Amino acid sequence: MNHASIVSSADGRQEWPTVADYRSFTHIKHTLELEACRQNGPLPDGAIPLAAVVRNERVLIEPFLNHYRRLGIGRFLIVDNGSDDGTFEYLAEAPDVDLWRTDASYRKAGFGAYWQDGLLSKYAPNRWVMYADVDEFLVFCGMEKGLGSLIESLARRGLSRLFAPLLDVYSQTSIDRTVIGPEQHPLEVCRWFDADGERYEDGLRGVSVKGGVRRRLFFEDHGSSPELAKYPLVFYDDETALVTSHFPEPGRKNFGAIPHGRLMHAKFISNLNSKIELALRTGQHWKDSLEYRQYQNTLSKEQDFTPYYGGSAEYTGPHSLVSAGFMQDIFSNET
């Protein structure tokens, strides 16, 4: 059945397909695009997997894996979408990575969301899971307790997903000179963020968040600025599905959310120009890579461009985001 067609209910009424209908389509069409390269067997009971799609992420892949290992991720389900910079070879040697590859269209696969959905629903049903991009680093109060304690606290509140919007971070120097070493955490270098300018409003699929440095420097029009809302940690039951990277289905679970974490977004580093070139050449990103065209238009006008300005605030740990009003401490009222 085509996922966009209308189906008939038992009493003859016409209805839109359910999440299960939609998922069956994505499984058939998009999971078959993936070539299995390495699999480590079934997930152990209680293990939390993380699904990601990568392409030419050699700069950040090591700190990314190490960050989430420290938080308690037990297995990585990673799709390599045509890397030629050593990313695939590095992942093939990582003992906790299940690895697939494909040269299929990232855009037609829901910007990677359909691949993630297919893998998570097949290999990790009815358990807590994560999904994230390689430049996204989850922080929350009580990180030293790990994801297990965070999940327990969410469950006590009757929540089945974590609202953790993106927060763009950057250094005090130019983007070109913002270099991340293989054993260096990006937040050691990119410690600054815009202290104001975020706006929350209810959207079609949940709480929408716009603003931050990308709106300030690249998207003056609030409506066209990139979406920051994310729910990277979810309980993956039968009705949950990823149809976009920002709003998991069903959307009703995304409303009324309070941010108890943030995804620190380390996009503005020395490899940005190569990312721009790849995005413009392939046209595989949102609106024919509109975001990357905006980056190119702005960065080409000024040498040594830096996002840092007088309204920047320094990240010194999760509680600095609580103090700045960017999230709440989920453990603050627990004994």
Name each region found by the language model.
Residues 72-73, 125, 133, 158:
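Short loop/turn motifs at secondary-structure junctions
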Residues 2-25, 113, 140-335:
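Catalytic-site signature of metal-activated, phosphate-bearing donor transferases
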Residues 55, 81-84, 94-96, 102-105, ...:
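An acidic- and aromatic-residue-enriched active-site/binding cleft used to recognize and process polar
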Residues 66-74:
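Short, acidic, metal-binding catalytic loop of nucleotide-sugar glycosyltransferases
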Residues 74-82:
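Short beta-strand/loop segment that forms part of the nucleotide-sugar
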Residues 1-66:
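N-proximal low-complexity "stem/linker" segments adjacent to membrane-targeting elements
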Residues 28-29, 86-131, 139-145:
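Active-site-proximal specificity loops/subdomain of glycosyltransferases
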